């Protein structure tokens, strides 16, 4: 079938199961070939082909609402709703988004990127439907990994209590990104092996209705037998107790089973949970055999071998550098423990976990719990390292503030993927952490200029005993600089001058140091002397150096790959105001007050005006123009 010609999913209504099987094979081949060039979330999407097709055949999108939790598994949905011709632009600048996008299609009714939000969104839509008196079906599709998120459980509790008509699709592939952990995962494992509970329950009810009633005694006995068999057949009937009608488990790759259960769910009043078993990566052997999450999301790859197409790294990844430095220090200090909310692979903690399994905690998709658990460990004189992506740290704001900072506990937070991350887009850009971390009392916040300084910052954080400390570091690899053999500690709140200058000064840190140095060198050719300062401590500021700069009265330019509102530049302005030095000329460069879309980091920096060219132009505007000499002077 020509998948690029699909306009909407109505063509599915008249197709037989055999034709749908052929369509599924075509879709899988399309995804494998397309993502081999662009990269993307191949594993999750190969696993939901039949489920997505079945949903669009049985229901009527966009009238009926599909809410894809996390959203990385929505490629098949995009294909069936007329966006196949755009797949060659997937996750590229101004191209097809890798997640549902409301302004991209009327079929995308809920935008996602972070996990565990679909059930709460669905509850809101169901409540609105009932208030308006309409009759659409609401169908959140949530994975077994996302179901471990606290927000999802809060929503289950409310939905079950309100008894709203809703069909929750539990896409159970036994993985989120990495293999799932926790008691809910264990419970779902029991359900997978328990058989079809709903069929047994219906048969029992039919049987009991045929037994002649002898007073109320037999009826009561029959009900007790039914309840006992329920718990015998399905250990831990969590969803039924929450108020849901539980259906399944169902083979998520069998159209016959999917159609039977989806039609049953349509006729059932109140909230229904359909438990669907799928195979992540189905149809492509390298992805299907993946046990640790390597094929969850990838770059380009060779179809025949499954080898990834990427240049040999000249330097270690930032995640690897940080985790391996922590691991090295853990050999000398048994109090060091590592915590990750479901990202052991992305955070490169596999080596730590293998060497120190009793000191490694993957808590699942539970950022709030991870932060407060770190606080608990710190109260017992342990040294917790919380490895967390910047975008997911947003979800633990209150726990960092209330449980870690307020108690002034020695927790080291490694803020991975800080700054622009590129193709994953606006839900994943790590640009807000400075603004929400720097106002927290007791918090130290820093970012290194390169991987050598990075390893020393990790050591500084581990040795720091005066409260919480956080280190930001970007996605990708280091710069390939020479690494010191001996680890050092860096004085808290100390900056360093990287390039001398007397006409103006740039205050910056991390990834934007390179463009600052390049701009300073360009202006040097024009006879302008610009100082570049590595403001590696975002909090506390180096007040001694700042005071010296203010005494010189020269213009100041701050640069940050983070939001300007409440950011590093704001802290410098606040300091200057408090010092009654408002006559100093100050300009700030950074991320504007908007969400930054997907695309390459270079393209995004160009779009927002954060390049060496714009830095140089800004400095030229700030510096006084030398007076022209007259003729004969």
Swiss-Prot record:
Its EC number is 2.2.1.7. Pfam families: DXP_synthase_N (PF13292), Transket_pyr (PF02779), Transketolase_C (PF02780). It catalyses: D-glyceraldehyde 3-phosphate + pyruvate + H(+) = 1-deoxy-D-xylulose 5-phosphate + CO2. GO terms for cellular component: cytosol. Keywords: Isoprene biosynthesis, Magnesium, Metal-binding, Thiamine biosynthesis, Thiamine pyrophosphate, Transferase. GO terms for biological process: 1-deoxy-D-xylulose 5-phosphate biosynthetic process; isopentenyl diphosphate biosynthetic process, methylerythritol 4-phosphate pathway; terpenoid biosynthetic process; thiamine biosynthetic process. Thiamine diphosphate binds at residues 72, 113-115, 145-146, 173, 284, 367. Pathway: Metabolic intermediate biosynthesis; 1-deoxy-D-xylulose 5-phosphate biosynthesis; 1-deoxy-D-xylulose 5-phosphate from D-glyceraldehyde 3-phosphate and pyruvate: step 1/1. PROSITE patterns: TRANSKETOLASE_1 (PS00801), TRANSKETOLASE_2 (PS00802). GO terms for molecular function: 1-deoxy-D-xylulose-5-phosphate synthase activity; magnesium ion binding; thiamine pyrophosphate binding. It comes from the Bacteria. Its cofactor is Mg(2+); thiamine diphosphate. SMART domains: Transket_pyr. Disulfide bonds: none annotated. Catalyzes the acyloin condensation reaction between C atoms 2 and 3 of pyruvate and glyceraldehyde 3-phosphate to yield 1-deoxy-D-xylulose-5-phosphate (DXP). Homodimer. Belongs to the transketolase family. DXPS subfamily. This is 1-deoxy-D-xylulose-5-phosphate synthase. The lineage of its organism: Bacteria, Bacillati, Bacillota, Bacilli, Bacillales. The gene is dxs.
